[in-house]
Amino acid sequence: MADAKAVAKAELKSKDFVPRGNKSSSPLNTTLYLGLRALDCYIQYLILSRATGSFIIKFFGGSIIPHGPPVEAGFMHIEKLGLSGYRLLLLFMDILAAAKHFWFVLTVAEEAWTLTGAIVVGLDNIFFDTLNNLLFLCAATSAASSKAGGETLANPYLATGFIIFAVGLVTECVCEIDRKVFKKNPMNKGKPYTGGLFSLVRHPNYTAFTIWRSGLALASGGMIYGMSIAMFFMWDFSNRAVPALDEYCTKRVSYGPRDSTSTNWSRIWLLMTSSLVRRYVGRV
């Protein structure tokens, strides 16, 4: 394999929010991004628990689903949230995703955050989480509508969505940990990691992100919405993030013949998810 070399920003034609190869410190931009991730969790709580989400839906002429009974967990701080078990689990998934991003930024990531990247990625998460929960509250689109099974923990959309979410989030963490361990070894400096899941898929972390995002969408807005989110991120990664990363890696070090394995695996996952939901939910 050829030796790794530095790649100047001017050499890269693809657009990406991550300044590849720039490992300088960016405390202000990093703090801004993490602040937006924390704010996202509070916004989702307001949407799920108070009149914020209901007001938005009614403003646009929609109707909302009935609020399920508050969960009785035996823990005062949880019960004070006033959320049903379904809504509490949706909020929990949002918080877990944000916690994963905190962990990644503070312990794994090496590239500096740009101001644009911090704002765009932070607002992107707020947008999709807000869209999820507004569609959950809207009677016409909710995965918890009476037709879909109601706002109960036994709702098949919630159960299936949570499993998919957990698989995707854990897989993404495993990918990042494996790659981090590989990079910490001085003998691997400048080498691309091709072990673990990276030996099967060129970009397993992008695939895993798509998986957990689609699981969260499924639990909020049902199967059609969940599949739409999966297809959107497959398109976004295939046309933006993957070409940008591949270009950087190709210019930095010989990577071997390029393939589209990650995209194919994402499509395979989409088909598997569709079959799984059809089996347990019984409707599209």
Curated annotation (Swiss-Prot):
Q: Name one Pfam family in it.
A: DUF1295
Class of this enzyme: transferase
Report TM segments: 88-108, 157-177, 215-235
Look up the record and name the pathway of this protein: Secondary metabolite biosynthesis
Tell me the Gene Ontology biological-process terms attached to this UniProt entry: methylation
Q: What is its main location?
A: membrane
State the compartments where it is located.
Answer: Membrane
Identify one Gene Ontology CC term for this UniProt entry. Answer: membrane
Glycosylated residues are 22, 29, 205, 264
Tell me what topology the record assigns in the membrane. Multi-pass membrane protein
Its Enzyme Commission number(s) read: 2.1.1.-
Classification via InterPro entries: UstE-like
Q: Which domain of life is it from?
A: Eukaryota
**Keywords assigned by UniProt?**
Glycoprotein, Membrane, Methyltransferase, S-adenosyl-L-methionine, Transferase, Transmembrane, Transmembrane helix
* Protein purpose: Probable O-methyltransferase; part of the gene cluster that mediates the biosynthesis of ustilaginoidins, dimeric gamma-naphthopyrones isolated from different fungal species. The first step in the biosynthesis of ustilaginoidins is the production of gamma-naphthopyrone precursor YWA1 by the non-reducing polyketide synthase ustP, via condensation of one acetyl-CoA starter unit with 6 malonyl-CoA units. YWA1 is then probably substrate of the ustZ to yield norrubrofusarin via a dehydration reaction.
Family statement drawn from the similarity comment of this UniProt entry: Belongs to the class VI-like SAM-binding methyltransferase superfamily. Isoprenylcysteine carboxyl methyltransferase family.
Q: What is this protein called?
A: Probable O-methyltransferase ustE
Organism, as annotated: Ustilaginoidea virens
UniProt gene name: ustE
